[in-house]
């Protein structure tokens, strides 16, 4: 315990003893997460700005991008635009990680998920690009600092 306190500068009373393998301390850990970690910020009513933090190509869904929504809401029937590349796409699928990919009808500000775009070239969805709604675009793309240093 002294080593953790000294190496990480964490007060002894804030250290939680947890073993997922044995199931000890897990309820306390979950409660501490709720109490200590602030909820995501962002206005779900503003124009969509979602930061692309990873992407890959799927032979059935096209380019799949992993995103964190900074502002706005993304629905599974939206047409999106990647602000840097200018590429537009109708969504094939929208979802979250649980830990498998699970389709959902919408994502809102503060959430992390994936977007199957149907695009054929992964270069059209680069890490650091910003996704917005094609018919109601945001005024400016995100920067990594604006997104909490996410990339």
Language model features with spans:
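Conserved catalytic-core segments of large NTP-driven translation/proteostasis enzymes
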Residues: 5-151
């Amino acid at each position: 315990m002294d080593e953790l306190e000294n190496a990480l500068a964490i007060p002894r009373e804030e250290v939680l003893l947890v073993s997922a393998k044995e199931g000890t301390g897990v309820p306390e850990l979950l409660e501490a997460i709720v109490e200590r970690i602030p909820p995501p910020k962002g206005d779900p009513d503003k124009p969509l700005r979602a930061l692309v933090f990873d992407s890959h190509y799927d032979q059935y869904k096209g380019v799949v991008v992993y995103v964190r929504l900074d502002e706005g809401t993304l629905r599974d029937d939206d047409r999106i635009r990647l602000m840097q590349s200018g590429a537009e796409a109708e969504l094939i699928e929208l979802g979250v990680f649980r830990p498998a990919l699970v389709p959902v009808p919408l994502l809102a500000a503060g959430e992390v998920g994936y977007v199957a775009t149907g695009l054929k070239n992964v270069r059209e969805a680069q890490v650091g690009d910003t996704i917005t709604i094609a018919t109601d675009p945001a005024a400016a793309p995100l920067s990594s600092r604006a997104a909490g240093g996410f990339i």
